A protein has these predicted regions:
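N-terminal acidic, proline/glycine-rich, low-complexity intrinsically disordered segments
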Residues: 1-14
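Basic, flexible Lys/Arg- and Gly-enriched helix-loop patches that mediate nucleic-acid binding at interfaces
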Residues: 17, 21, 25-267
Length: 267
């Protein structure tokens, strides 16, 4: 499925209004995938809302388990029946991963009141997804959206060493010395914090760089370039693992089975 970024009136519904259907009889709605999860995790797993929002619903006494209120850390048991605002918790949506060719100007925060937030796109999709990682507002390229927490951990955890390839335009010709510095790893300081980039693959042609990272430090490439006297003009992510970005700017669609294999081949 492919979708366009066009917010609709229906996106103004609350999460509970949008996701919870008619009242259901008091029967088990906690499949094996929910058993052992904390209550707020189980609600988030259903796709109804985020963990933080689920904890808020619980604290506002809008959640019942088997007809009784429970704390957010309550562990789901086989046979539990969960209700939110008197309605049955919806079944968890199938685990999916989508590709989004993020344009410059879209912020990866999920603030629903920010017109430039990716939240405006997420509200138009047929299921609840969240960004796997982020790209700066001034950057573009391949961004993954998913509802699969296990996949998110595999792709985002620092120990997993996932490759991410970027095409970077800088403000001047790149010297051999600068190229070697970037490849070997550079350091930069923000306030009292000192950061260090790991050795990485870097290629240069005139003022264009190709950089392959396995780290995910905040605004890492911009700080790396600044550390060697270069200013980033454009930054575009073209690959995650073996998954290459070939779609037009703004395209948002679910990955094919073959693309999932490319994405997870090294995870």
């Amino acid at each position: 499925m492919t979708t366009a970024f066009s917010p609709s009136a229906s996106s103004t519904k609350t999460l509970v209004e949008a996701a919870v259907g008619e009242e259901a009889p008091l029967i088990n709605n906690s499949p094996a995938t929910l058993v052992g999860l904390r209550l707020n995790q189980a609600i988030a797993h259903s796709g109804l809302c985020s963990r933080k929002a689920a904890a808020r619903l619980i604290s506002e006494q809008r959640v019942l388990v088997n007809g009784q209120q429970q704390p957010h850390h309550y562990l789901i048991k086989t046979g539990d029946f969960i209700q939110v605002d008197g309605k049955a918790l919806p079944e968890a949506a199938p685990r999916q991963c989508w590709l989004y060719h993020k344009p410059v100007g879209i912020d990866c925060n999920v603030k629903s009141d920010d017109p430039n937030s990716i939240a405006q796109l997420l509200a138009t999709l047929p299921l609840r997804l969240f960004p796997l990682g982020r790209l700066d507002k001034d950057s573009s390229g391949l961004l993954l959206l998913s509802n699969d927490g296990a996949l998110a951990h595999r792709l985002m955890h620092a120990d997993q060493l996932q490759q991410k390839e970027y095409r970077v335009e800088v403000d001047k010709l790149v010297t051999e010395a600068q190229l070697q510095q970037l490849a070997a790893g550079v350091s930069w300081q923000l306030g009292t914090m000192l950061y260090q980039s790991d050795p990485c693959l870097v290629q240069a042609e005139n003022n264009l760089l190709t950089i392959v990272l396995t780290q995910g430090l905040n605004r890492q490439i911009r700080y790396m370039c600044r550390a060697v006297g270069l200013k980033v003009l454009t930054l575009h992510r073209v690959r995650i693992n073996q998954l290459q970005l070939t779609d037009d700017v703004g395209c948002c669609r679910s990955l094919t089975a073959d693309e999932m294999l490319l994405l997870t081949s090294h995870s």
